[in-house]
Amino acid sequence: MDTLNVELGTRSYPILIDAGLIGRPDVFRQHLGAHDVLIVSDTTVAPLYLPALTASLAPRRIVEVILPDGEAHKTLANAARVLDVLIANRFGRDCALIALGGGVVGDLTGFAAACYQRGVALAQVPTTLLAQVDSAVGGKTAVNHPGGKNLIGAFHQPVLVVTDTRTLATLPARELRAGLAEVIKYGLICDAALFGWLEAHLDELLAGAPAALAHVIRRSCEIKAAIVGRDEREVGERALLNLGHTFGHALESATGYKEWLHGEAVGAGLSMAAAMSRECGLLAGDEAARVRRLLERAGLPTRIAAVTPAAVLEHMSVDKKVLGGRLRLVLLRAIGDAFLTADYPAPALARTLAAHCG
């Protein structure tokens, strides 16, 4: 079993990575004690992994909430549903919430854990590649709003992340490709060697090779854990993890969270960020082409025809990185060298949107 740590002083926590962890009672006993547990999952994941998880957690009192699957259900109403169950079952402040699922379940459950009695323990058990490499780590929790993605949320770190790599064996190919977008992002922001490794080993990843997947999960978590440890609240370096996400979140919200998986929208957003970096004279043309080729090989969209540039720009205007009325973007100087800036020419953004939308 691989163990990484997110170093946050007294709130530090482990990321455990191995096959079969959901079925190991010792993993949960060590970190959750004997407290009451509320498990939140969805209609896709629960039939596959909920029985094994509940068996590992016995003999605690366990209550379950099963949500519909999909980004469209990451809502304040469903978070309220989780809170209603906690209150109805008289859960105390010593309870724990466990998120069993992908990014939607993890974000929503984390938000409920942050809200309930001003914060209770949270364990993340991510079952998708995207959640395992990104959303389960770092303490960002949120629900969506019709006006924008993740506009309602809180920072609330888990006490434990249990990454059972065996869950990837049941992951649909589309979900696997979506998760690779976040892995590609890590290479782009700070690890050119990882990006080169992805170019060389992408076929293994797409085929679901366990060793290749374990490698990218560990490396992605190493990068994110280090960044979160240095900048938990995203006042500086952590903003780099949003490469492609300002574009991607706008694409998701502009299409009502129904058209694209989050990772697919991020893939298109990474293509747009690379293209805009080239438009601004920052990123060499051959490197921008490498980014686009890798995204295309991964089966990720590099443009979105179903939404207009004006609609995307409107949704970008409510992004959380807007400061003083100015939209900040994460751009690239090179593969492995990202930076946050509000100093870019508006025509470059307009050309980028026109080339990738509509």
Describe the function of each predicted region.
Residues 1-96:
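ATP/NTP phosphate-donor binding region
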Residues 197-310:
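Active-site segments that bind and position negatively charged phosphate/pyrophosphate groups
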Residues 7, 31-32, 90-92, 115-117, ...:
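Solvent-exposed alpha-helices and their adjacent loops that cap or buttress functional pockets
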Residues 2-4, 181-183, 282-358:
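C-terminal charged capping/lid subdomain of soluble metabolic enzymes
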